[in-house]
């Protein structure tokens, strides 16, 4: 086949394969952006105005020091936080919301992502993101790490005791 332009959407899981195919055919590629972040869970009332008035709020902030783009993504009103597993059992966090009333929770969750564009000679942003996820998995034996905002501000890990005293009940029950 021949074409002036093609679109290929292989996703993160197919990126290594696609890069190999391109290299084998002499096709130049560009290093993409990697998004690294956390999933934030708050009580519904915190996000009530945005949840009622927007389908999905897209909040964007640029950091003053490095001008990094920080954004919200995948907001789940009255939803739950969930674990997803990638190749080799890599645990990552995601969120879901359900239409049915019986599955709704009292919490809203969303991803808070920092978008990083690296400069040459760096070529592997997806591998970089995976390495960060693997280090997180190492800290908590392959589970999802949970931390309250208060503990984050104090620079300490959240203990089960402090989590039980929190005014928000996390929807992901096996987080550590």
Where in the sequence are the language-model features?
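Residues forming the flavin
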Residues: 1-176
């Amino acid at each position: 086949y021949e074409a002036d332009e093609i679109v290929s959407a292989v996703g993160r899981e197919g990126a290594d394969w696609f890069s190999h195919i391109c290299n084998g055919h002499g096709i130049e590629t560009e290093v993409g952006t990697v998004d690294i972040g956390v999933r934030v869970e708050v009580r519904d009332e915190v996000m009530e105005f945005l949840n009622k008035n927007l389908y999905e709020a897209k909040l964007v902030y640029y950091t003053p020091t490095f001008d990094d783009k920080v954004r919200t993504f995948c907001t789940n009103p009255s939803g739950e936080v969930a674990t997803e597993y990638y190749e080799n059992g890599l645990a990552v966090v995601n969120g879901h919301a359900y239409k049915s009333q019986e599955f709704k929770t009292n919490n809203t969750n969303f991803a808070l992502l920092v978008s990083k564009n690296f400069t040459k000679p760096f070529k592997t942003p997806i591998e970089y993101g995976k390495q960060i996820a693997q280090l997180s998995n190492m800290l908590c034996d392959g589970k999802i790490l949970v931390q309250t905002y208060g503990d984050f501000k104090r620079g300490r890990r959240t203990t089960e005791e402090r989590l039980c005293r929190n005014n928000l009940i996390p929807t992901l029950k096996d987080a550590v």
